[in-house]
Amino acid sequence: RGVCSTPEGSCVHNGCICQNAPCCHESGCNWANVCPGFLWDKN
């Protein structure tokens, strides 16, 4: 599931990286456009 334990409070979920704390949720990552700093991890 989602991982929200990074020092920056970022969320990593199935290849998606939300660099903003509000993007991080207990169930995973916020996939909506309302999340600023939404990036795709091509790796």
Swiss-Prot record:
Q: List the disulfide bonds.
A: 4-16, 11-24, 18-29, 23-35
Cellular location(s) = Secreted
> Could you state a single Gene Ontology molecular function term?
toxin activity
- Modification type 4-hydroxyproline: residues: 36
- Mind telling me which GO cellular component terms the entry cites? extracellular region
UniProt entry keywords in alphabetical sequence: Bromination, Disulfide bond, Hydroxylation, Ion channel impairing toxin, Neurotoxin, Secreted, Toxin
Expression across tissues: Expressed by the venom duct.
Traced from the root, the source organism's taxonomic lineage reads: Eukaryota, Metazoa, Spiralia, Lophotrochozoa, Mollusca
What biological function has been recorded for the protein in this entry?
Answer: Mu-conotoxins block voltage-gated sodium channels. This toxin reversibly blocks voltage-gated sodium channel in cephalopods, with no alteration in the voltage dependence of sodium conductance or on the kinetics of inactivation.
Residue ranges of the propeptide: 1
Q: Which residues carry this modification: 6'-bromotryptophan?
A: 31, 40
Q: Name the chain's protein.
A: Mu-conotoxin-like CalTx 12.2.1E
